[in-house]
Amino acid sequence: MSRRAVLVDRDDTLCPDVPYCSDPADMHAFPDVPASVKRLNDAGYLVLMVTNQSGIGRGYFTLEQLNAVNAELLSQISAGGGRIDDIFFCPHRPEDNCDCRKPKTRMGLQAIEKYGLDPAECWMVGDHDKDIEFGRQLGMRTVKVSAETSFSDAVDTILSESAKSQNNPNNREETY
């Protein structure tokens, strides 16, 4: 049986975007994120972070610094009862033309393979058009967060639409 997941961008989705964040003290999850992640966990979704982190390729911070910043975010989410199950990141600069920087799909394909995911049962949540394009290319449903649509709102949509699709699998919107 294939598994379902919510893939989620990091910056401006789970936490404010601190450009090239290299200090864990600068990492602060949005207030609604820990409880919202827990709701996804409780509903049986894996929660996988997929994030472009070109600061590594630009030499602004190291892999160790990125890991420390991500560990701080995960600690804050865990303190609120939520769990990020895995992190996939692209360390390359845009001009490197790699195959993992969103909207290219390598990070998503790695997640699908590693966890045996069914993309039709998965969601991508992010704040940029490239996040939405990434999810669409993988065959996932998508939710774009913004100043008007919080991560908690996105989770409301996912849980509501998942319940609807279980009752009527042919009634499926792709983007919210």
Task: Describe each region flagged by the PLM.
Residues 11-31, 56-65, 80-82, 92-99:
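Metal-dependent phosphoesterase signature
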Residues 13, 51, 142:
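Ser/Thr-centric signal marking residues that sit
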Residues 1-48:
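Active-site neighborhood of HAD-like aspartate-dependent phosphohydrolases
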Residues 33, 37-70, 86-93, 135:
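Substrate-recognition element of Asp-dependent hydrolases with the DxDx(T/V) motif
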Residues 2, 6, 64-85, 93-124, ...:
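Asp-based, Mg2+/Mn2+-dependent phosphohydrolase catalytic module
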Residues 7-8, 25-29, 45, 61, ...:
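Broad hydrophobic/π-residue packing in well-ordered secondary structure
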